[in-house]
Amino acid sequence: MEFRQLRYFIAVAEEGNIGAAARRLHISQPPITRQIQALEQDLGVVLFERTHRGVELTAAGTTFLEDARRLLHVTEISRVRSRAASRGEIGELRVAYFGTVVLHTLPLLLRQLLSVAPSATVSLTQMSKNRQIEALDAGTIDIGFGRFYPYQEGVVVRNVTNERLFLGAQKSRARSFGEQVHCSALRNEPFILFPREGRPSFADEVIGVFKNARVEPKVVAIVEDVNAAMALALAGVGVTIVPETVAMISWPDFGFTELVGSKATVPVSCIYRHDHIAPILKTFLNLLPIRESQ
């Protein structure tokens, strides 16, 4: 059975006349007759009966007409979807993330993708940086987001934005610094940094920012994540440094002051394999901003 046979059959059934169907299809009558006969032979049934006006569907033909229309409809949908997939307009983008990028930066980027490819789907999985690299190699994710990725052959690391840094502390303590505080003013502050694992990490970057400002930070604890750091800071153990995405959220009894001096920013990066870029990933990558690390 061929798709052209279905098209010819539907045209004859709807027109009730082979000549009219030929004019509709812009072909001569003999090819239609041959293909209808071949279709009947393939199905093992008679689809049409001749009348003085043309042809009429048999009972078998009436039943097959419904199926033929359904088959062509499904085929057309498949054709449209496959072409859209090849253009990166549909498909599933499998995204992994680590850290606070999921709070603000990543949702904004995914919103851009869905605005140009509304039929696309997105899956999100939290993964450490090393697991993201393993998942890229295994082909179980398309792209990962985080900070400070280690070098891995075949994996592209691309900086997509830079976030400002903020001091986080009990609200009254944070307010005492004003709207901005320079690194040099925090020389004697006890710091709670994060994360403990996945070095180099955000904690290493924060230490580097202070050292570039000629300040040796007094680190009293390096904890698992931002939640633990903020909990200890709220308890009065010390102060912490967080990226802008965390400071954008309203936290009860917790305040933030912008850190300035010595390029007090941290990058948000994405990683993907250069030799495995699916069309939907290519569409997403074309939407991502390109930023220089600061």
UniProtKB/Swiss-Prot annotation:
Residues in the DNA-binding region annotation: 18-37
Keywords, sorted A to Z: Activator, Aromatic hydrocarbons catabolism, Cytoplasm, DNA-binding, Plasmid, Transcription, Transcription regulation
InterPro entries: ClcR_PBP2 (IPR037421), LysR_subst-bd (IPR005119), Tscrpt_reg_HTH_LysR (IPR000847), WH-like_DNA-bd_sf (IPR036388), WH_DNA-bd_sf (IPR036390)
Pfam families on file: HTH_1, LysR_substrate
Record GO cellular component, one term: cytoplasm
PROSITE patterns: HTH_LYSR
Gene3D superfamilies: Periplasmic binding protein-like II, Winged helix-like DNA-binding domain superfamily/Winged helix DNA-binding domain
Residue runs in coiled coils: none
UniProt keyword annotation of Transit peptide present: no
Subcellular location: Cytoplasm
A Gene Ontology biological process term: catabolic process
Domain HTH lysR-type: 1-58
GO MF, one annotated term: DNA-binding transcription factor activity
Entry function: Involved in regulation of chlorinated catechol metabolism. Transcriptional activator of the clcABD chlorocatechol oxidative operon.
Protein family according to the UniProt entry: Belongs to the LysR transcriptional regulatory family.
PANTHER family reported for this sequence: HCA OPERON TRANSCRIPTIONAL ACTIVATOR HCAR (PTHR30346:SF0), TRANSCRIPTIONAL DUAL REGULATOR HCAR-RELATED (PTHR30346)
Protein name: HTH-type transcriptional regulator ClcR
Lineage: Bacteria, Pseudomonadati, Pseudomonadota, Gammaproteobacteria, Pseudomonadales
Gene label: clcR
